[in-house]
Amino acid sequence: MHIVVVDPSRVVLKVISGLLTPRGHTVDTFTDSREALDFVTDNASVTALITSLEVRPIGGLELCWSARLLADAHRPLYIITMSSARNARNLAEALDSGSDDFIDKPPSPEELHARLRAAERMTGMQRELIRLAETDSLTGLLNRRAFLQRAGEAADRAGAHGRISMILADINQFKSVNDQHGHDVGDTVIRGVAQELLTEAGGIAGRLGGEEFALALPGRTLEEAEAAAGRLRLRCTQLRFKGQRGPVQVTASFGVSTWSEGETVGGLLKRADIALYEAKTTGRNRVVSAATDLILARAG
């Protein structure tokens, strides 16, 4: 686990770090609780926070509460408070402030390791629940809701002057695959195309529904996104699947758009969708960009 430990005493920090590091944990220690909170905020790899109640400038209870707000639906974070004054009031206040557990200070090695094993079990279950809630069960890509959220977060990180581009993809004449070869083969085709989306490094890939997919590309220009869509289009034409009536070959159409200042992810998707429609109605197996005046006018 990646563990942050907060205590005003460097001696206590050294003792706890000495207990945890030999067990394979990554440990960062802080005497300043505000610095600790900033570190936890900026490092999603942190899965456990151990804090004394007697910390400054942010008190231990406030630190628990603030850290708990970071542990949203996408980030497991197990919080353990510790105090040399163990009593019912301190325990209740800590748990009410978002702590998951309470331990004496200084903790005994056996108890500390046991409680961290419990923390590992809990965060492991939380990660699995998050995975199930965000993943499309057929393809392993993000589902629509999770994709929109992740793409929105990427756009927020990019800021007003950042770059993010969007690719929408749709398997051409997919209904005929299901009709001629059955839904099992259709599912295999969907999984095959989905795997191609994962070949674009740094992309956020999702299945929006049916045979439609989306790929958000943070930091990519329109030209770079067009090139990526071109590579994906070519790879899709090279896919072969075993069907009930012989080999199955498919193609896909692609719509591409890029970020405009003040635009939402919804607007980015809308323009990519209009470009995708243009690709499908002008021959299929094409890449069309939303940069043309015609498509921009339709998006407006």
Language model feature labels by segment:
Residues P8-T29:
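Two-component/phosphorelay signaling modules centered on CheY-like receiver
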Residues V185-A205, E212:
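Active-site-proximal alpha-helical element of nucleotidyl cyclase-like catalytic domains
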Residues I130-Q149, A169-H183, R191:
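Conserved nucleotide-binding and Mg2+-coordinating catalytic segments in signaling enzymes
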Residues A205-L208, V248:
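A short pre-motif secondary-structure segment
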Residues I130-R131, R144-R163, A194-A201, P218:
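Short regulatory alpha-helical coupling segments
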Residues E62, R75, A85-D101:
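Alpha4 helix (beta4-alpha4-beta5 surface) of REC/receiver domains from two-component response regulators
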